[in-house]
């Protein structure tokens, strides 16, 4: 989590000042973002990727090692107020953990002008927490979101979709 660094704003400012750097992006779980969002934007950070694997407060505490979901929302709101060029939310889907939240996570694109990106869990041999049943394919995401409409590719690696009345896209990574 980069925001635990007390000097993260000056680090980002230094990176943005390097000749040839066209864009500075930051990935965070957003729990520490609210107090520094405007400063990060002023330092030259143009895009954010916010990790949010669950919207259940108890599961959120578990997956982030005691993070508070409310702090994520405060960070998201602060990021929107700071007017970053693009904000993307990332969720790694895990069978038996958050696969029941596909619709609620996707619906964040109806409430906020953000993209929601679903990332397939990387297969890990002999992982103590995630067996083969933990893998959730992007086809399963589309089954949960039958109203999602295919969008034109934006040059990235995700397959893009949009829900009716959404403010952002849904990206699927496989």
Tell what function each PLM region has.
Residues 1-2:
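Glycine-rich, proline-tolerant flexible connector loops at the mouths of alpha/beta enzymes
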Residues 51-55, 119-121, 173:
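Generic beta-structure capping elements
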Residues 93-97, 120-125:
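Glycine-rich beta-alpha junction loops
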Residues 5-109, 115:
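Radical SAM/AdoMet-radical enzyme domain recognition
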Residues 111, 121-124, 128-174:
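Auxiliary Fe-S-binding modules of radical SAM enzymes
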């Amino acid at each position: 989590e980069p925001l635990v660094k007390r000097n993260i704003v000056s680090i980002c400012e230094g990176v943005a000042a390097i000749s040839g750097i066209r864009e500075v992006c930051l990935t965070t779980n957003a729990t520490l973002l609210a107090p520094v969002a405007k400063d990060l934007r002023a330092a030259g950070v143009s895009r954010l990727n916010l990790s949010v694997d669950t919207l259940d407060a108890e599961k959120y505490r578990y997956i982030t090692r005691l993070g508070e979901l409310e702090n994520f929302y405060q960070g998201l709101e602060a990021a929107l107020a700071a007017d970053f060029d693009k904000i993307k939310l990332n969720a790694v889907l895990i069978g038996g953990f958050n696969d029941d939240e596909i619709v609620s996570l996707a619906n964040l694109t109806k409430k906020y002008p953000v993209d929601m990106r679903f990332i397939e869990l990387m297969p890990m041999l002999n992982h103590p927490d995630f067996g083969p049943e933990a893998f959730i394919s992007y086809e399963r995401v589309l089954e949960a979101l039958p109203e999602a409409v295919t969008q034109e590719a934006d040059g990235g690696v995700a397959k893009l979709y949009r829900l009716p009345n959404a403010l952002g896209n849904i990206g699927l990574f496989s």
